[in-house]
């Protein structure tokens, strides 16, 4: 069984006669759903319906299709793994920008559920990266908006405060210390070791080599 969709949305699919049943595929506009060794022969049609009726970006629609497959019984061998790869429609030559999602769940009792959680976390980190780029370009307000989006997707406990910590560091580096302090404090509330780590950043060039500044940041984290 093989399926291909090119960048223009053209599809080519083949399900061979020796694929283990239930096996089959369905092709739609710009997509293909295929499966083999399924418990029921309703899986690929259910995937297609879910994909077409769902909203959101490509990752969200693919997850909807996977969930629909599981609802029809999924793989007759049971559940174990799931994966998703999504790349930008137009490449920049910079892999870290073009590969939007590249996630795998190798062994889990609920692989699609776990993959869905990881996609949500990746969305948060994608928003963090966008915020960093805005701040680096001097568009701090746009950066703050992206950071808020990121932290709404990833609660502090989901990252042990790391997302909030690096937001704070980026704002300190941009000279926005008062705005950085609440984020750093959020990180500290999750794990007090963030106060130790911030003191190590000047040696790596990530913050100014200013002991008074570091002392102030640590003090504000601990308030």
Model-assigned labels for residue ranges:
Residues 154, 190-191:
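Alpha-helical junction/boundary sensor with strong preference for TPR arrays
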Residues 161-166, 193-218:
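TPR/TPR-like alpha-solenoid helical repeat scaffolds
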Residues 1-126, 137, 158:
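N-terminal nucleophile
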């Amino acid at each position: 069984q093989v399926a291909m969709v090119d960048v223009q949305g053209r599809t080519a699919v083949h399900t061979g006669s020796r694929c283990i049943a239930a096996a089959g595929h369905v092709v739609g506009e710009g997509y293909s759903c295929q499966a083999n060794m399924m418990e029921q022969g309703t899986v690929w049609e259910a995937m297609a319906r879910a994909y077409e009726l769902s909203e959101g970006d490509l990752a969200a629609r693919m997850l909807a299709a996977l969930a629909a497959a599981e609802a029809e019984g999924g793989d007759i061998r049971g559940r174990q793994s799931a994966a998703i790869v999504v790349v930008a429609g137009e490449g920049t030559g910079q892999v870290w920008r073009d590969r939007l999602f590249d996630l795998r769940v190798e062994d889990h009792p609920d692989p699609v559920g776990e993959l869905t959680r990881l996609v949500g976390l990746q969305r948060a980190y994608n928003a963090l990266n966008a915020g960093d780029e805005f701040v680096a370009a001097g568009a701090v307000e746009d950066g703050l908006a992206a950071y808020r989006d990121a932290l709404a997707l990833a609660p502090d406990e989901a990252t042990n405060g790391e997302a909030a910590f690096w937001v704070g560091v980026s704002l300190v580096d941009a000279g926005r210390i008062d705005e950085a302090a609440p984020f750093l404090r959020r990180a500290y509330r999750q794990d007090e070791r963030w106060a130790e780590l911030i003191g190590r950043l000047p040696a790596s060039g990530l913050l100014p080599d200013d002991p008074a500044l570091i002392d102030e940041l640590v003090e504000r984290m601990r308030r």
